[in-house]
UniProtKB/Swiss-Prot annotation:
Protein name (record): Phosphate acyltransferase
Gene: plsX
PANTHER family: FATTY ACID/PHOSPHOLIPID SYNTHESIS PROTEIN PLSX, PHOSPHATE ACYLTRANSFERASE
Keyword Lipid biosynthesis: yes
Superkingdom field: Bacteria
Native organism: Alkalilimnicola ehrlichii (strain ATCC BAA-1101 / DSM 17681 / MLHE-1)
Enzyme Commission number: 2.3.1.274
Length: 342
């Protein structure tokens, strides 16, 4: 019998709050009989959302009250200091207390990272947690981190990100010796800033399967299973790729609607276009992991719909079953031991 997994959901976070979280939770429970979900938030609005979507509390789904909500534009320090009973914070505290195995929020990213770090603390050997997400590539998909948690990083931080990303690729995807690439402005050794060059040397000297520098266009070529960068570069790269994908979709729609012949061509190409949309649909990859914490926390996109939020739930279940924080801790410990041994 499969062991049950309990996940706490910040029901008030994101652009749509319980109107997305409630249907996503109901659908996830229908797919996974070993799953239990806690909806954390203002009790009455959450229960009303459940009823609107044909659900109610049960042995596998219940509401945990939290009186406050962190606004999407609220400064992280203010949220951490003044919103001690926020749905975001209470959801993470349930992980800390052992009542939940993981927490998911579509709320304010900065506040989520600050709160998770304050409540759960970081793993030994990890200076800063990082945000990791999955991106589509020619070969399937890859994991990329950091995506915005750490704007300025040292070489040591980048090395720690590489270890965490490698462990996740190995645990979640079952990839033996995941290929780790360092995002840079060129593949030549002379290129890059001092932090990137030092991180490159550290990775070269490590037992990780380091494949060298990866340029921006190489992210999507499937050259690496894990792409490592600082949060500033990673966030810009991710948002730029989303913008380009949106621009291409805009051009395709405009061209197919130009005249009768292009409309007919669009109808003929519809199955191909639907398949393409499914492969690059960002909803498929929703659910960014906050790695390096003493617990599992995922960030859903603020504008996610129920399908996308459901994907984040599936990722959280997988990370719980694989014991990702424990695996990161063990891998770091073994790397440090190998480094210190003569």
């Amino acid at each position: 019998m499969t062991e049950s997994v309990t996940i706490s959901l910040d029901a008030m976070g994101g652009d749509h709050g319980p109107d997305v979280v409630a249907p996503a939770a109901l659908a996830a429970l229908a797919r996974n009989p070993a799953l239990r979900l806690i909806l954390v938030g203002q009790a009455e609005p959450v229960r009303q959302a459940l009823q609107r979507h044909g659900g109610q509390e049960s042995e596998r789904l219940w509401v945990h009250p939290a009186s406050e909500v962190v606004a999407m534009d609220e400064p992280p320090s203010q949220a951490l200091r003044t919103k001690k009973d926020s749905s975001m914070r209470v959801s993470i505290q349930l992980v800390k207390q052992g009542e939940a195995d993981a927490s998911i929020s579509a709320g304010n990213t900065g506040a989520l990272m600050a709160t998770a770090r304050y409540v759960l603390k970081t793993l030994p050997g990890i200076d800063r947690p990082a945000i990791m997400s999955t991106i589509p590539t020619k070969g399937g998909y890859a994991h990329m981190l950091d995506l915005g948690a750490n704007v300025d990083c040292t070489a040591e931080h980048l090395f720690q990100f590489a270890v965490m990303g490698s462990v996740c690729a190995e645990a979640i995807d079952g990839v033996a010796q995941p290929r780790v690439g360092l995002l840079n402005i060129g593949e030549e050794e002379i290129k890059g800033n001092d932090q990137v060059k030092r991180a490159c040397q550290m990775l070269t000297d490590s037992p990780l399967n380091y494949v060298g520098y990866v340029e921006g266009d190489g992210i999507f070529k499937g050259l690496a299973d894990v792409v490592v960068c600082d949060g500033f570069v990673g966030n810009v790269a991710l948002k730029s790729s989303e913008g380009v994908a949106g621009l291409i979709a805009h051009y395709l729609r405009a061209e197919f609607q130009r005249n009768l012949f292009t409309r007919l061509a669009g109808l003929i190409a519809l199955p191909v276009l639907r398949s393409l949309r499914g492969r690059i649909d960002p909803r498929q990859y929703n659910g960014a992991s906050l790695l390096g914490l003493r617990g599992i926390v995922l960030k859903s996109h603020g504008g996610a719909d129920a399908f996308a939020f459901g994907r984040a739930i599936e990722t959280a279940v997988l990370e719980v079953r694989k014991g990702v924080p424990r695996m990161i801790d063990q891998r770091l410990e073994s790397l440090l031991a190998a480094k210190e041994s003569p």
